[in-house]
């Protein structure tokens, strides 16, 4: 559970770090499952280290990880922040390569479709060795909108990853009235004012997906997995957005995953008899997002 001040911290700044929420024994077991899932996806081939390797549905693929999703230490804070009828959105296990430029995971602040990412790093990460950097308060208007030019750097990256096009970047440059290659806000991407959320194995980061975040200087193959939750969609616009995110997930699987599946969600997870998991996937089943 979050204290009232911890909840206020999250709502105001857009993130909170729960230090050593998971024990060393738990982290050892989780790390073993992480390696097993990603090795299985690569069919036991070595990680080439050329591009990011991401496995969608990561937390759904092993009993230990599914148990973590409904663990009080994860579930109860999410319930406090999103409400008792919150839904499951997705998860992924990642081996990262290079920097991750400034971006937000959600670009729809006006729809009030609140989403939270829970991130767990399996290795120590610092300011200049790949930890998550965040811009506090950037999940709230008007600050969120004022930072929109920052997406330029990330849009260049996703072109290289095969997830966007130069035409889309050109359109963004035109909309923002910026010049390609110029210093946004007068600084390099890595010098944008921010807070580095340095992390040790066992720490867990909760952050609003509208929050601007990045990572710089990390080693090739740094390991991190996420669990993503959302408020229960109550408007047609929110449901449409949920469906759109489902389609984007399918596109990302084709680019970053080795063993491609048409299914976004694991069968055992989607049709679990566990009350908490049943509750958070009920909307997905209702909408046919399997």
Can you name each region flagged by the protein language model?
Residues 103-115, 192-193, 199, 220-221:
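A short beta-loop-beta micro-motif enriched in histidine and acidic residues
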